[in-house]
């Protein structure tokens, strides 16, 4: 009962936060509109509550300083990392480069030239283009509820999903892009792209395709959750036998009965030589 009360208290607190007009901690500051239907669906269940979400986004990120106390952290974001561009809106993918150039504090060089060999070090601050798909975290009342949600997500192709501590289910899919576009020349303060504008257009087209695939997957997940977890009352006319889950005590008693039955059969006259 205490665990149930703790879950219900947590759920009430989360739902109050969702209803609040205060910005959240994400770069956008609000729940993505595309996530609202599936969030509302899941939160309608007494056994689940959503804790965080992202409907999918395109971002351009400038890595921060990677050296710390004389050590270089390869590939780390480090200190001073900066979001150059972020959008969760499919319609705002095309044209991000022009918008970034008009607003950025940096100057730009789109030469398409490779990085000079002498500058390729572990401390270089790369410009990273990313498409990140839908992700949803759901806290469940117990492991049984978490397992049902996990299995439902996996059956829809969300193969990166998992169950963490406290019955927290992470629903993820691997349709991402993660591509370096250039680097920051810290001497001149210039963002130097070693890809061409044409290559950026190719990435944008790929991202649009991934947005579309992502939306289809989200809809498939919504439909499956609605069918299997929300509107899942058994059909009284169904011929399928539904086997109830055994408790530990029931399993212990069954094993005891089976053992006694085996002993009885071994002692029967037909088994005596």
From Swiss-Prot:
SUPFAM superfamilies: SSo0622-like. Residues 243-273 are annotated as: Disordered. The keyword Phosphoprotein applies. It comes from the Eukaryota. Pfam families: TYW3. The keyword Transcription does not apply. It catalyses: 4-demethyl-7-[(3S)-3-amino-3-carboxypropyl]wyosine(37) in tRNA(Phe) + S-adenosyl-L-methionine = 7-[(3S)-3-amino-3-carboxypropyl]wyosine(37) in tRNA(Phe) + S-adenosyl-L-homocysteine + H(+). The modification Phosphoserine is found at residues 26, 238. Pathway: tRNA modification; wybutosine-tRNA(Phe) biosynthesis. GO terms for biological process: tRNA methylation; tRNA modification; wybutosine biosynthetic process. Keywords: Methyltransferase, Phosphoprotein, S-adenosyl-L-methionine, Transferase, tRNA processing. One of its GO terms (molecular function) is tRNA methyltransferase activity. It is an enzyme of class 2 (transferase). GO terms for cellular component: cytoplasm. Belongs to the TYW3 family. PANTHER family: TRNA WYBUTOSINE-SYNTHESIZING PROTEIN 3. Present with 3390 molecules/cell in log phase SD medium. This is tRNA wybutosine-synthesizing protein 3. It comes from Saccharomyces cerevisiae (strain ATCC 204508 / S288c) (Baker's yeast). The lineage of its organism: Eukaryota, Fungi, Dikarya, Ascomycota, Saccharomycotina.
């Amino acid at each position: 009962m205490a665990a149930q009360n703790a879950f219900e208290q947590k759920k009430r607190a989360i739902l109050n936060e969702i209803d609040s007009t205060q910005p959240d901690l994400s770069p956008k500051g609000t729940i993505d509109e595309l996530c609202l239907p599936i969030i509302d669906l899941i939160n309608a269940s007494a056994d689940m509550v959503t804790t965080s979400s992202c409907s999918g986004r395109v971002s351009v990120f400038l890595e921060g300083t990677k050296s710390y106390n004389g050590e270089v952290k390869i590939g780390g974001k480090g200190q001073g990392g900066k979001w150059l561009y972020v959008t969760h809106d499919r319609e705002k993918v095309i044209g991000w480069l022009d918008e970034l150039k008009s607003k950025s504090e940096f100057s730009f060089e789109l030469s398409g030239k490779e990085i000079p060999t002498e500058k390729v070090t572990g401390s270089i601050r790369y410009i990273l283009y990313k498409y990140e798909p839908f992700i949803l975290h759901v806290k469940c009342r117990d492991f049984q509820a978490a397992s049902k949600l996990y299995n439902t997500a996996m059956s829809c192709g969300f193969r990166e999903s998992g169950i963490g501590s406290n019955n927290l289910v992470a629903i993820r899919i691997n349709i991402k892009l993660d591509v370096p576009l250039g680097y920051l020349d810290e001497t001149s303060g210039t963002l130097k792209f070693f890809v061409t504008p044409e290559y950026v257009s190719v990435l944008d087209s790929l991202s649009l395709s991934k947005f579309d695939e992502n939306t289809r997957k989200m809809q498939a997940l919504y439909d499956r959750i609605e069918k299997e977890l929300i509107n899942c009352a058994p059909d009284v006319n169904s011929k399928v036998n539904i086997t109830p889950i055994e408790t530990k005590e029931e399993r212990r008693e069954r094993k005891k009965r089976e053992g006694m039955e085996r002993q009885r059969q071994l002692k029967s006259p037909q088994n005596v030589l």
